[in-house]
């Protein structure tokens, strides 16, 4: 058998080829028909399902809220002016104390700018320091014992320190109002009387020193009223010192100053004797000057009598 020889007739091959191709087309058409029927059936089933089931309403799409842009805000410390405004008295006092400790050069500026403390406020502050001493005394112990003294010693030192500072601020030339100075000194001296009489020798020495210094400040304050430049000017222009002394004597009498000093002198065992002598001498000086002024006035009236009528009557006789 020769290679490549075709044993089947060509007609047979053509008919067979056509037959195969026709079968393929027939099968293809049959597949398309079945596929179409299947698709239509499935679509029919879907449509039937859609008719039988209630259609749910489409949900409303959720709108995304737009983010509002806000300015960036961060916390910050209070301004110094607000800090001073909202702080209580104790906190403000501690703040100033720390400031003066860190910057002592600020003290001069504060003294220049701060207003003059009122007498009432100064006395209240001093009273608070005194109350600290009394409040820290032991309950189940002798008040005058060494134990009691040692327990309140820090508060006693604070009281005496405050007393010293305030006393100096009420002396001339810082305080030129004599009545203000004497009112303060009278209150301070009364507080010294009220201190517990501790038997401790250190306290007894401190108390004696306090009385001596207070007596000296009484003399300084009272002498300022006598040596005041305004009073000296009035006395020189009117040639009557009694005019200036009259105001001082009136202050002494209105405030019952001599009786107060005598009480202080009794409680301090004679420490205010010189103060009493000075005040009494001022009153005596005023009275003597007033008497001499009245006598001079009467003598002047005698020399100013008009004798013209008497002389005329004598000439007629």
Curated annotation (Swiss-Prot):
Compartmental location: Cytoplasm; Nucleus
Keyword terms, alphabetized: Cytoplasm, Nucleus, Protein transport, Transport
Pfam family, one: Cut8
GO biological process, one term: protein transport
Listed InterPro entries: Cut8/Sts1_fam, Cut8/Sts1_sf
GO terms assigned for molecular function: proteasome binding
GO cellular component terms, semicolon-separated: cytoplasm; nuclear membrane
Annotated region (Disordered), positions in chain: 34-65
Primary residence: cytoplasm
Biological role stated in the UniProt entry: Involved in ubiquitin-mediated protein degradation. Regulatory factor in the ubiquitin/proteasome pathway that controls the turnover of proteasome substrates. Targets proteasomes to the nucleus and facilitates the degradation of nuclear proteins.
Family statement drawn from the similarity comment of this UniProt entry: Belongs to the cut8/STS1 family.
Complex formation: Binds the proteasome.
Listed name of the protein: Tethering factor for nuclear proteasome STS1
């Amino acid at each position: 058998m020769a290679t490549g020889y075709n044993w089947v007739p060509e007609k047979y091959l053509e008919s067979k080829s056509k037959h195969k191709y026709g079968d393929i087309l027939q099968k293809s058409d049959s597949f398309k028909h079945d596929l179409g029927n299947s698709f239509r059936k499935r679509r029919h089933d879907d449509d039937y399902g859609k008719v039988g089931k209630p259609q749910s309403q489409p949900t409303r799409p959720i709108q995304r809220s737009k983010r509002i842009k806000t300015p960036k805000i961060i916390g910050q410390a209070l301004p110094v002016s607000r800090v001073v405004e909202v702080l209580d008295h104790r906190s403000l006092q501690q703040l100033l104390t720390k400031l003066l400790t860190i910057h002592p050069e600020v003290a001069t500026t504060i003294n220049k700018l701060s207003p003059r403390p009122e007498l009432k406020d100064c006395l209240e502050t001093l009273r608070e320091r005194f109350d600290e001493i009394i409040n820290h005394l032991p309950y189940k112990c002798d008040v005058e014992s060494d134990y009691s003294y040692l327990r309140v010693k820090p508060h006693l030192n604070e009281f005496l320190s405050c007393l010293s500072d305030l006393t100096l601020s009420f002396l001339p030339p810082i305080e030129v109002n004599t009545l203000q100075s004497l009112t303060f000194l009278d209150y301070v001296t009364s507080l010294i009387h009220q201190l517990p009489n501790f038997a401790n020798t250190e306290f007894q020495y401190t108390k004696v020193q306090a009385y001596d210094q207070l007596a000296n400040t009484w003399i300084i304050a009272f002498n300022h009223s006598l040596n005041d430049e305004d009073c000296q000017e009035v006395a020189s222009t009117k040639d009557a010192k009694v005019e200036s002394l009259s105001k001082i004597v009136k202050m002494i009498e209105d405030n019952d100053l001599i009786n107060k000093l005598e009480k202080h002198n009794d409680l301090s065992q004679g420490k205010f004797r010189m103060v009493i002598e000075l005040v009494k001498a001022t009153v005596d000086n005023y009275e003597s000057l007033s008497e001499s002024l009245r006598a001079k006035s009467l003598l002047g009236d005698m020399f100013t009598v008009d004798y013209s009528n008497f002389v005329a009557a004598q000439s007629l006789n």
